[in-house]
A protein has these predicted regions:
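Beta-strand-enriched, solvent-exposed domains that form extended recognition/catalytic surfaces
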Residues: 47-207
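Conserved SGNH/GDSL esterase-like catalytic core that processes O-acyl groups on lipids
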Residues: 232-420
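Structural recognition of the beta-strand scaffold that forms the well-ordered cores
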Residues: 207-211, 215-219, 310-315, 371-376, ...
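Mobile gating loops/cap/lid regions near enzyme active sites that modulate substrate access
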Residues: 451-625
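Sec/Tat signal peptide C-region and signal peptidase I cleavage site
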Residues: 40-46
Length: 669
């Protein structure tokens, strides 16, 4: 079948399309052609730098979670400058610190409940997300192309050749069959001798799953941060009474009572309040596109033109190996929309979700394999959040209450779990993961944590700075130093032993039981803990987040209208502006997410949105002591080389190109 060239710069071919798919392709091909020249990486153009004609090709929109190519192109563009961290900073500046994901999150092949769209309409074409049968590809001739040359293209995937003749300066867009090679041949006709160039096009679709806890999920980095109001919102204290109330910035556009007195306790006020919250890729798990796992998968797709990445994010904030990976766990938030509330209260075990997805994929494509698992887990197992609470909760009333309810952790209990229980849990996890990755745990890339409490390589000094969002918070210097030392000297080294079967950790078959371990980012994190400050930090941070813990107006009359002592509005805070700290402090957690966790029975949480419990939870449940988007980007930079090595991608992608000088056509007398 011959396909006519488009009237603009490009042409499209279709292979074995249904009439409806053909119609959809015709709708998108114009836009695809217009951007084809822009998306070609510099390496592709450089292939013909020596003057020899070559066929250059790349998969379009090859991070398949994205429905629309424009969301992928912003990453390919900014990643050309170098690292994922540099890309994140560039995107942050471009968005004025509001974040690149705030628009992308609504254009994905997985919805906020975690349901995979099958099929998923990507750039106007319906595709199976888990089991693609074809991929969109752009092909062009590179090198010293003769002026005015005409290219006769032929594509053959075994079902007969498809042909199109266009100007050689124009790209060709077509959908390549998955699982079989397509032979691409171009005959170049010009005033010079005719030439023929041939290559094979075969897309490698890489299936990656992301597993783990809040570090893996991207906690602390909502895809669309909460919009805060510039006036104050009242919280009660556990001591009660007007004298113990305090004001902090509220949620923008909230029409209810801002004072503690007269608040709506019916429950409807809470629902209205929740509609104004931050938005996440998955609210139940505080799953975010800023997660290092997602950023590394995007970068992998950007770096290699001949692959596509099918990515399944399953990590969940609060997950342990026992509750989260093997068993169900409590959800962090419900999904609130204007028409409904989705709130099951629990999240299905990640390993169960992964097995189900693989089983569904193999029913359609029996040869479909899981190529890579990205994993970070273990911090919740040793109750790291309890250790953090023990460091920052300073008020006597709150400490007494939280000690009785088990919120405050202890180093002794954490150390006992690290030494006795965590090795057993890792052994069980290895046995569960091994059959999912073909029997070789090298395909599990375990990325360790950065120490969150260091600056200049030493523990942060402590104090209220970064934590004065709640009156009872104050990072105790002694407890902070002990926890930082425990993390650095005991927890992180033990995780490495567990992943690599070292340090006395017994594995059944060390040669196949060792995970691929990543910790190269830890040195950089030693200069970017939660207390790191720089003259280049955002002006809002420098003016409004006090180094002495005096960020908020203490007089409740004045605070009701001007809660910040700096006099600026909370709406000026930019969650994704570049800053020295790569770890969210409690102030960041509140200003970025202001989370009211709802993943439990409504009877277990107060209906009054001014209640003292919400005051504490909203300060920490949005990601206090978790990496920022920059921190996640640094982790992704560390993980990416390990991923490419395991996948055998290495450096430049191999390409077999055959060139022939064709005989000149005989001249007729």
């Amino acid at each position: 079948m011959t396909v006519r060239p488009l009237p603009l710069a490009g042409a499209a071919l279709r292979f074995a399309m249904s009439p409806s798919l053909h119609t959809a392709m015709r709708r998108i091909v114009l836009g695809a052609v217009l951007v084809a020249g822009a998306v070609m990486p510099q390496a592709a153009v450089a292939q013909g730098a020596d003057g020899a004609l070559q066929i250059s090709w790349e998969v379009r929109n090859r991070f398949r979670l994205f429905r629309e190519e424009r969301d992928f192109l912003i990453h390919t563009e900014t990643l050309r400058a170098g690292s994922i961290l540099a890309s994140e900073d560039a995107l942050a500046v471009r968005s004025d610190g509001r974040g690149w994901a705030r628009n992308t999150v609504g254009r994905l092949c997985i919805d906020p409940t975690g349901r995979i769209s099958e099929p998923c309409t990507r750039d106007g074409v319906k595709e199976s997300y888990l089991t693609p049968t074809e991929h969109p590809v752009t092909v062009r001739l590179a090198g010293a192309i003769p002026v005015g040359a005409t290219c006769a293209w032929t594509f053959d995937d075994g079902d007969g050749p498809r042909q199109s003749t266009v100007d050689c300066a124009e790209p060709i867009n077509f959908r390549a069959r998955y699982g079989r090679p397509t032979t691409a041949t171009v005959d170049v006709s010009s005033a010079d001798a005719p030439q023929r160039v041939t290559t094979q096009i075969e897309v490698r679709d890489i299936f990656i799953a992301g597993l783990g806890d809040s570090i893996a999920s991207g906690e602390g980095n909502p895809d669309k941060p909460v919009a805060l109001s510039d006036d104050g919102f009242c919280f009660q204290s556990y001591l009660g009474g007007p004298a113990n109330q305090y004001f902090r910035p509220g949620r923008a556009n909230f029409k209810g009572a801002r004072a503690c007195e007269g608040g709506d306790t019916s429950g409807s006020g809470l629902r209205t309040w929740q509609l104004l919250g931050a938005q996440w890729l998955n609210p139940a798990c505080h799953r975010s596109l800023y997660s290092y796992q997602t950023r590394a998968a995007i970068a992998l797709a950007s770096q290699y033109q001949h692959i596509a990445v099918t990515y399944l994010p399953l990590a969940c904030t609060g997950a342990t190996i026992t509750e989260g990976l093997f068993g169900s766990q409590r959800a962090r938030e419900c999904l609130f929309t204007r028409n409904a509330v989705t709130c099951t209260g629990t999240v299905e075990a990640q390993l169960s979700q992964l097995r189900d997805a693989l089983a569904a994929a193999r029913r359609r494509q029996p040869s479909r394999q899981l190529d890579l698992v990205l994993l970070s887990v273990g911090a919740n197992d040793i109750d790291f959040s309890g250790l953090v609470a023990d460091v920052i909760v300073d008020g006597a009333t709150e400490r007494g209450l939280f000690r009785r309810t088990g919120v405050l952790g202890s180093l002794d209990d954490s150390r006992a779990t690290l030494q006795r229980e965590l090795p057993q849990r890792f052994a069980r996890l290895r046995e569960a993961l091994k059959p999912l990755v073909g029997g070789d745990l090298a395909h599990v890339v375990y990325t360790s944590y950065g120490n969150p409490a260091l600056t200049g390589g030493v523990p942060c000094p402590g104090g209220p700075a970064g934590f004065d969002i709640h009156p009872s918070f104050n990072a105790d210097p002694g407890r902070l130093q002990r926890v930082a030392a425990y993390v650095q000297r005991e927890f992180l080294p033990r995780l490495k032993d567990l992943a690599l079967c070292d340090g006395g950790v017994l594995c059944r078959d060390p040669s196949s039981d060792r995970m691929t371990f990543v910790d190269q980012h830890q040195q950089a994190f030693a200069d970017h803990g939660f207390c790191a400050r720089s003259s280049s930090d955002p002006e809002f941070d420098k003016q409004c987040f006090s180094a002495t813990g005096e960020s908020f107006t203490s007089d409740i009359v004045a605070a009701s209208s001007t809660p910040l002592t700096c006099g600026r509005g909370a709406s000026e805070f930019r969650a994704y502006a570049p800053r020295a700290r790569w770890i969210r402090d409690a102030n960041d957690s509140y200003f970025a997410a202001m989370t009211y966790p709802q993943g439990v029975s409504s009877s277990a949480l107060p209906a009054d949105i001014h209640d003292a419990t919400w005051g504490v939870l909203s300060a920490v449940y949005g990601g206090a002591i978790h990496p920022t988007a920059e921190g996640h980007a640094a982790m992704a930079d560390a993980a990416l080389p390990a991923m490419t090595n395991v996948l055998g991608l290495g450096g430049a992608e191999p390409s077999t190109i055959i060139r022939e000088q064709l005989p000149l056509a005989p001249v007729r007398p």
